[in-house]
Amino acid sequence: MSGGSVAFVNLGCRVNRVELDDIAARLEAAGLVPTAPAAADAIVVNSCAVTGEAEAKTRKTVRRMATLAQAPEVIVTGCVASLFASELSGLAPNVTVEADKSLVAGRVISLVGQGGGVPSACEGVTPTGRTRPAIKIQDGCDNRCSYCIVWKARGRGRSLPAVEVLSRLDETCGRGAREVVLTGINIGRYRDGGLDLAGLLDLVMARSDVGRVRIGSIEPPDVTERLVDAMARHGGRVAPFLHVCLQSGSDATLRRMCRAYDTAAYRQVVAYARDRLPKLSLGTDLIVGFPGETEGEFEESLAFCEEMAFSRMHVFRYSRRPGTPAATAPRQVDPREMARRSRRMRELARRMRRSEAERMVGSEQLVLVERAGRGVTGGLFDLHLDPSVPVGSLVRACVRSVLDDASLLGRLS
């Protein structure tokens, strides 16, 4: 059977996007051309099971892809595929489930054949058009947070050997990447023998000429002094940004979540990081409406977030994830109340982001140009600049002003 084109649909986290990029690269090497779902012979869906809503979205997406006019082969992978393979397979006759992502490219080729096309030109380093590619250095999680099922879907924590990290980094830089993100499900637990994440960062800096490295989302206990000191040692070559997952700013809620820290520990981590990294921008994830969250606990969480002065917050309303302790916990919060709390938290997030953006006016920023006239700073702020600056380049720019959406206006230094 002759092959042709393949489309990619990602649902969920950054790690899913990285895994989909790897699959796309293998299929492009086999001659299958990336295209839009409506024109594809095969569609790869990388699924997410982090919440009940995410799982429902996966099922809806698979059904929609399977019923497109050209009746494509739909190959589903990811966390929902690991947990509910038989249910996904039964959605349509042209749906194939492959939980093992290393086998997905082979499955696609077996269904539609190898292609002979020439990849279409697109901006970006990866076949899916991304300019800031990531390397998955770790997978799995050994935590047992009461709202999460990822540990079941992903398995126990395991790390990519450092030599393989360096090999992938060289390959990625060889494709033109100027910034690379180190990511994983729980990257702070990276271990290769005696090498931890701080040691890996030192090794990457010593063995690679990559322009900038960014550390992906990390748990508070893993933001060690060793890691922060390593970031400080390498200056601008490590993005001055940490996404430190909080989930709640109330100690009572954190205990019910079975998180491995309290607000005092979180505060201490942030204080040390800001002392050693004066230009640090701080991001986080935050859940509102967790079972049992009282109005007082929500107010505590709101106040703590304001104290931390996050520049980037992902605010989620709690969504029941069947199979987790939280799903059957007492005192589930009314959805209307969750929506109200979410609005208040998101408004705080907007105010804090704008405040951080205004603080950057007059500063010089290292900017990765992601598309014509638009780049991203080390602190993950969009910056508008001269559209003639080449896409993919890493340049220095002076911040002139803040726009209405809290993006920045700059000019080359």
What are these regions (language model features)?
Residues V244, D285, C305, M313, ...:
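Hydrophobic, well-ordered secondary-structure elements that form the walls
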Residues N143, G188, D251-A252, G373, ...:
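Glycine-centered loop/turn positions within well-structured domains
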Residues G184, S217, L246-S248, T284-V288, ...:
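Active-site proximal loops enriched in glycine and acidic residues that flank catalytic Cys/His/Asp
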Residues T328-S413:
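Terminal RNA-binding accessory module
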Residues V74-I75, L83, G174-E295:
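Conserved SAM/AdoMet-binding glycine-rich loop
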Residues M1-R189, G193, R226-D229, L242, ...:
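Proteins enriched for Cys/Gly/acidic motifs involved in redox and nucleic-acid/cofactor modification
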Residues W151, L254-M257, P325-A329:
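Short acidic, glycine/proline-rich loop/turn micro-motifs
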Residues E293, A309-F310:
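Contiguous mid-protein beta-loop-alpha structural module that forms a pocket-lining wall or clamp
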